[in-house]
């Protein structure tokens, strides 16, 4: 109550920010008459003037009024469109490292031209980020004329472009592309073997369109570049045969492990667990199928991967449904985005889940992959010097934007008042009662010529509604992942009088629904339309537009509530654009997933008390409040999952940044001989110390072991025992110096044969390849650590702190291994002629290019860790008894962790 009172007196933070910015808007409006008088050449010259002022030290913010006035005037001349005052406000918010919430139809694309132009003046680059390639190309082409009029260059970053074309796109003042492609280019740049292979500049300013979709919905989705791991498709097929024999536990009680069935399902967490009976049943079935030997256990050390396959197969059968979570097209399992309803070509679930679904559907099983490089969108976008975003629905996620990305959300007022009527939810007892009511509502409204948009949350539900409409004789269009090719066309005509469009999660974001249909689309369909034809089309559209307004505007029907209020708001936001009339209503049933899992008992009891009869609907503020609370519960849980994922990924991110920084420094220098000499001395010292401890007596020396190690690992054959016999007074320090001198001389002989320049190139290549190889193994080890770290909680230890501590120790050990491997490789390598070295380098480059193309987006669903399937650890060098312990202690393996083995 007190907060509301204070807000009323002083205004909210949002109000105060807009009040401050309105002063700048007034300033821009005062400048407008002066800018109108400028010739085209004088207006274009403003860009040169602004850049000169920035070079002299003027702040970017000081240019806002003049720069925005320049863009507004240029837009009027190029597009015939003038930025509204609210769009100027939006532009300032976006320049101010904030998120601008702008309603559908308020012109976000035109608003983005303001901060994009301003920040491009610095010459450091602007990245406009969109959710798909179509929008990236569309927005770039639509705005190209404006930016080129003002003297700025435009680049489009698309998948599959060759490196020179990508480099050119990134060198442009403003680059358009998708979040995936920007992220992949960052990872590829950090796998490059020469500075010329890199394409990105330093990350300066990112302007993210549909920011909620990219920074919230995609936050659990790591970007991964991967290579093939071992083939285990036969095992997936065998395990898949077992699952149909298992029985689901009927009652999900607290002690699910002791239950009657073979497995229990937790729908809230989307997890499935074997019961004690289930474990026994699975073991018996695996023995009968010949997968396991008689008497073996699933939890035997050798069968750990079996358990991984069983869990993946169970989840595939129980939690993932065809035409809801994925579709099967041309013998391929393609994931359906739960937030947009679009198919996600090229994405694969991790942890063997995708292979398990492929086995379930009987299609070809693709190999599991091993991660070579990965990053989450959360950590990628935080690399930018300046980040901003815009969307129609951000206010419900304002806390998350603030806490994770340090971005404030500012709600921009609409240019015209919103007059859409949002009707209360109607709740029915059963699914069929609800669908019957929806069909009746559609028939009544279309009879009056009112267009209707029906939003469903899955392809399966959209097809059920479509079948019922067909049965009722109602003509309609269906827009879901199966028919996405006609998306823009269907959405553009969804505002025709009496039109009925069924859309899955409103997949048509980016295309406005215009009341009366799109006259631009009609004109575009004609070849060389005459002026008379254009006038006739516009006149016909005006009649249709007025008829739709008279019928009440576009009516939105939601067939059930989504887990997130934001997705519901996106659906509602399709109606009532630019002050148009419209209405919306959600129809729910007690059989809906959200109601069944999160709100069932309370609402069902409430409905019984209110005396519900079959076919009747309840419309009550209590029910609406209960549903809103259920959505908040889910949103809160999903936020916790994303936050926890980020906390763990932050640990890996610190290490990633250190490795990539070191790698880039290495790429940018041509001579690493000093570094090699330093680590060679360090490695030899550590090796000698493990056999001849400093300040020790000669009886403690393991001379034979040292000779063997130097010969095996460094190709350095030295008669150390003979030296000690010939020189009984040979001091420990003198012996060390002699060994180091022999190693140095051996290395110089190799350098003389191959040539100094070729040796420098070879040293650099070995360092890069060894670093990449060990980093890949380190990523796998980090994933394994992450998967089991929660068990530390049972020992009263904080899993996050344990993860930080152990991952740091692993990182330190990796750096020690890096030094050892580099020196060992350079010492043992057989010297070849320069031509052979160049040929090997070319083969290496071709192989790295092939691997870089094997990229995938590992889609991690809300309930699984962001851990990838990384089984390939067999290439690891076996640690000898006299080798330095991998923990980095400096002791022999047999005297350190070897004892534990």
UniProtKB/Swiss-Prot annotation:
It is a peripheral membrane protein. Its EC number is 7.4.2.8. GO terms for cellular component: cell envelope Sec protein transport complex; cytosol; plasma membrane. ATP binds at residues 87, 105-109, 512. Residues 841-850 have a biased composition (Basic and acidic residues). GO terms for molecular function: ATP binding; metal ion binding; protein-exporting ATPase activity. This is Protein translocase subunit SecA. It comes from Erwinia tasmaniensis (strain DSM 17950 / CFBP 7177 / CIP 109463 / NCPPB 4357 / Et1/99). The gene is secA.
